C-alpha cells in the first residue's frame, strides 16, 4: 500500500467542479488553489479583474485548472447569475464554497442602514440564494458538497462586529438546516469557522496594530494568527470523498482560541 492510495481515497478532487466565491485573494484564494492542486477544476469568483486574473494565472501556473468568473454579488439575481455562469464555464457544479464576505467594525449603536444591508446582503442573503440556485446541479453530483465560510462569531460573541456576527451565526444555522433537508439528495453541507487569519484585509485592519497583535498572541494558545493555507486541510477534507458521512457541522480552525483561556500566568 502507498500513502498516495490513501490520499486518492480520502482527498482527491479529480473530475470535480468547484465554485469558490471571493476566491481572488486571502482565504478564498488559498482554498481555490488547494482544490485545484487536488484535481478539481475551479471557478475563481471575484469582482476585481486583475485579482481574478492573477489567481487564475497562479493556479494554472502550478498545473491546476481554473477559470475566471467576475460577477457582482449583492442580490438574489446576482446569485442566480453567478451559478448559471459557473455551470456554463465548468459544465456543472459538484462543490460550492460560499466564501465571499464583508465586514464593518463599529459599535451596534452606530450601525447605519447602509452598512447593515451591505453586510447582510453578501454574508447571509447571497449565501442562501447561491445554495438554492446551486441545489439542482449539486443534486446531479454523486455527492454534492457545500462549504460555508463562517467565523469565530458562528460559535461565540465578539464585540464591535454585531451585524457581521449575526450573519455568521445565521450561516451556521443555515448549514444545519440545509444538511437536514438535502441529505436525502446526498448533498453534504458544512461550515468552516476560521480564527484570526492573516489576509490582505486583516493585515491592514487588525495585524497592523501592535496592541491588537499582542492581545491575540496572548489570547490564542498557539500565540499567533493563522495563515490562509492553514485552513485548507479542513477545507479540502470537507469537500472530498473522505467526508461523505459528515454533514451539518461547523469546524473551527482557530489555533485553540475557542478552547478557552487559562487562569494561569502564561510563560
Regions found by a protein language model. Name each.
Residues 136, 180-184, 244:
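Alpha-helical segment proximal to the catalytic Tyr-Lys
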Residues 151:
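Residue(s) in the substrate-gating loop at a strand-loop-helix junction
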Residues 90, 128, 224-253, 258:
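C-terminal substrate-recognition "lid" of short-chain dehydrogenase/reductases
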Residues 2-9, 156, 236, 247-267:
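Short C-terminal tail/terminal secondary-structure segment
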Residues 107-108, 112-120, 212, 216:
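Substrate-binding pocket helix/loop in short-chain dehydrogenase/reductase
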Residues 131, 167, 175:
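Active-site helix of classical SDR
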Residues 17, 24-25, 48:
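Conserved glycine-rich cofactor-binding loop
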Amino acid at each position: 500500500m502507498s500513502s498516495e492510495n490513501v490520499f486518492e481515497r480520502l482527498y482527491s478532487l479529480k473530475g470535480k467542479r468547484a465554485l469558490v466565491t471571493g476566491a481572488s485573494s486571502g482565504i478564498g484564494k488559498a482554498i481555490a488553489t488547494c482544490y485545484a492542486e487536488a484535481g478539481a477544476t475551479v471557478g475563481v469568483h471575484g469582482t476585481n479583474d486583475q485579482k481574478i486574473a492573477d489567481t487564475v494565472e497562479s493556479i494554472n501556473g502550478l498545473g491546476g485548472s481554473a477559470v475566471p468568473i467576475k460577477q457582482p454579488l449583492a442580490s438574489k439575481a446576482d446569485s442566480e447569475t453567478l451559478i448559471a455562469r459557473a455551470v456554463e464555464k465548468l459544465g456543472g457544479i459538484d462543490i460550492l464554497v460560499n466564501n465571499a464576505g464583508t465586514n464593518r467594525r463599529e459599535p451596534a449603536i452606530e450601525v447605519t442602514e447602509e452598512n447593515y444591508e451591505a453586510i447582510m446582503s453578501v454574508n447571509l442573503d447571497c449565501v442562501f440564494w447561491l445554495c438554492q440556485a446551486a441545489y439542482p446541479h449539486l443534486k446531479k453530483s454523486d455527492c454534492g458538497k457545500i462549504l460555508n465560510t463562517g467565523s469565530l462569531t458562528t460559535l461565540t460573541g465578539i464585540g464591535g462586529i454585531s451585524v457581521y456576527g449575526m450573519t455568521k451565526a445565521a450561516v451556521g444555522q443555515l448549514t444545519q438546516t440545509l444538511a437536514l433537508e438535502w441529505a436525502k439528495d446526498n448533498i453534504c453541507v458544512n461550515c468552516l469557522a476560521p480564527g484570526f487569519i492573516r489576509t490582505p484585509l486583516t493585515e491592514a485592519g487588525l495585524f497592523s496594530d501592535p496592541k491588537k497583535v499582542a492581545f491575540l498572541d496572548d489570547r490564542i494558545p498557539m500565540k499567533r494568527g493563522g495563515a490562509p493555507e492553514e485552513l485548507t486541510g479542513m477545507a479540502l477534507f470537507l469537500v472530498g470523498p473522505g467526508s461523505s458521512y459528515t454533514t451539518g457541522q461547523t469546524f473551527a480552525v482557530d489555533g485553540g482560541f475557542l478552547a478557552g483561556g487559562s487562569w494561569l500566568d502564561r510563560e
